[in-house]
From Swiss-Prot:
It is an enzyme of class 2 (transferase). Pfam families: ACPS (PF01648). Its cofactor is Mg(2+). This is Holo-[acyl-carrier-protein] synthase. The keyword Cytoplasm applies. Keywords: Cytoplasm, Fatty acid biosynthesis, Fatty acid metabolism, Lipid biosynthesis, Lipid metabolism, Magnesium, Metal-binding, Transferase.
């Protein structure tokens, strides 16, 4: 049974305005938006990315979609740091929860989470489905 559904869209150009260029290691390491949104493993990928703004936009949309699926949004016991997006060996996105997000998922009776992330020239979008 579906216990949560969330979707979000992020404008890549808005993220680009806040993110240093690829290859600017010091700038990327100190990027305030990235430090707020990304977990440590995600941050390492962001810094090494050839398209860091696009990577961050996709993670931002994914985490916002997850927070909506949890029914809390970001800030009511759930932070960006409580949601982590990784990829399986085929490149498909995976989502995991910790802290307040894991607590909220458990309170919903959630046992599985599904995520889809897509991006085009101007936008990144994500959808999260939580199942019991």
């Amino acid at each position: 049974m579906i216990v949560g559904l969330g979707t979000d869209i992020a404008e890549i150009e808005r993220i680009e305005q806040k993110v240093p260029a690829a290859g600017d290691i010091k700038g990327l390491e100190s990027c305030r938006l990235a430090k707020r949104v990304l977990t440590e493993p995600e941050m390492a990928i962001f810094i090494a990315s050839k398209q860091p703004a696009r990577y961050l936009a996709k993670r931002f949309a994914a985490k916002e979609a997850a927070a909506k699926a949890l029914g809390t949004g970001i800030g009511r016991g759930v932070s960006f740091q409580h949601i982590e997006i990784s990829n399986d060996t085929n490149g498909a996105p995976l989502i995991s929860f910790n802290g307040g997000a894991a607590d909220r998922l458990a309170s919903l009776g959630g046992a599985r989470a599904h995520i889809s992330i897509a991006d085009e020239k101007h936008y990144a979008t994500a959808t999260v489905i939580l199942e019991s």
